[in-house]
């Protein structure tokens, strides 16, 4: 059986650097698809679907920082991928700043980003794999093991201030008992945010099979059942 390709797929390319747009378009062509470079200014978020319909777009590639070279777009690439996801268009994010942005501008939208590729390691093979993965997740609801969420309990370590945002630092033994992970306080529903205090336990849907911290997403937060919480604190020796 021949390996799957991007044949007949039209792939929109959001990238504020013209040379990178052309390079990505060339890689898409090598994968069997048709690259559609989005020239500046890029359409606004609420005009994306109109643009996709007009250009017959099937998939999307986005750089994360889209305003480093002028006023290409007033939003992050992560926002564009997430908006596309919500409307049934699969997309991938390409960035060299995945670790710097992981806990804030990436984590806010990570649930709706099927694949994230480091730009220094981008090549035809991993681009094709990521785009086909995005298509399968969005259109067929086929998630890779690393993208399947699981009900996960976590301990709040602290809440850090970062510019105008607050980052909740947690530890999840179901993922890595020695590595702390952060996410924006805004991900937690407003009525539950008061529980984001050091020592408290939270529960969320998390893709704990992800190998990299920047691939983790957090969704559907809840508080532990009071009886279960009391039992857990007794086991852990907490007051």
Task: Report each predicted region and the residues it spans.
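A short helix->loop->beta-strand "cap" motif at the edges of active sites that frequently abuts
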Residues: 86-90
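Conserved acidic residues
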Residues: 58-59, 114
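Output/docking surface of receiver
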Residues: 16, 38-41, 92-161, 167-176
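Short amphipathic alpha-helical segments and helix-helix/interface helices
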Residues: 25, 78-82, 105-106
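Conserved acidic segment of CheY-like receiver
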Residues: 2, 6-19, 24-28, 60
